[in-house]
């Protein structure tokens, strides 16, 4: 169970380990794992504006988000800024897991099945850094 790994991470002082909820019925196990090493693990999977603070309160050091930021597979800066305002930049991890399409790398979500409108490149990274 996830709590086993949380205890293992705590024993070896591994900070920032990820708990990813991939499917329904994972909330209870994830919450239990967070209790095993509070404020040292990151949680992702179904994170959105209305539940992010709850996961921080349950013991997550940070929340990991992808799908919420891409309604209909299109990046929403407004959603990112709202989530950042709600939990704080230091508590937010934006997952930009990608799949290759031709010669490009595209941010993917929903278990890498859905490609978004965001391409990952040095230029895109530079633009986002300049924004803030």
Language model feature labels by segment:
Residues 2-42, 46-56:
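N-terminal active-site wall of soluble small-molecule enzyme domains
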Residues 56-132:
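Conserved anion-binding
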């Amino acid at each position: 169970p996830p709590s086993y790994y949380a205890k293992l991470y705590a024993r070896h002082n591994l900070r920032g380990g990820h708990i990813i909820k991939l499917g329904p019925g994972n909330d209870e196990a994830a919450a239990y794992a967070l209790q095993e090493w509070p404020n040292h693990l990151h949680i992702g999977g179904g994170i959105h504006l209305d539940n992010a603070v709850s996961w921080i309160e349950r013991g997550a050091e940070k929340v990991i988000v992808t799908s919420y930021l891409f309604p209909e597979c299109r990046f929403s800066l407004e959603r990112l800024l709202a989530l950042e305002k709600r939990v704080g930049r230091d508590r937010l991890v934006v997952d930009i897991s990608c799949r290759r399409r031709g010669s490009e790398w595209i941010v993917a979500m929903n278990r890498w099945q859905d490609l978004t409108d965001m391409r990952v490149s040095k230029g895109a990274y530079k633009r986002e850094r300049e924004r803030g």
